[in-house]
């Protein structure tokens, strides 16, 4: 199956900084990763949005 595009949004400011490819099969939980936010200028939690 093909991958769908999803983006990772910063929890602090809400900006969508990263885009990723995720499998099209549904998952019960969404991906959460600590990444650098260029607007907050710090490492923050980013959650998967569709």
Curated annotation (Swiss-Prot):
GO terms for cellular component: cytoplasm; ribonucleoprotein complex; ribosome. This is Large ribosomal subunit protein bL33B. NCBIfam families: PRK00504.1, rpmG_bact. It comes from Streptococcus pyogenes serotype M1. The lineage of its organism: Bacteria, Bacillati, Bacillota, Bacilli, Lactobacillales. The keyword Magnesium does not apply. InterPro entries: Ribosomal_bL33, Ribosomal_bL33_sf, Ribosomal_zn-bd. The keyword Ribonucleoprotein applies. Keywords: Ribonucleoprotein, Ribosomal protein. One of its GO terms (biological process) is translation. Pfam families: Ribosomal_L33 (PF00471). SUPFAM superfamilies: Zn-binding ribosomal proteins.
């Amino acid at each position: 199956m093909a991958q769908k595009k999803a983006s990772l949004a910063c929890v602090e400011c809400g900006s969508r900084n990263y885009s990723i490819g995720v499998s099209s099969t549904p998952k019960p939980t969404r991906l959460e990763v600590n990444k650098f936010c260029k607007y907050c200028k710090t490492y923050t939690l980013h959650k998967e949005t569709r």
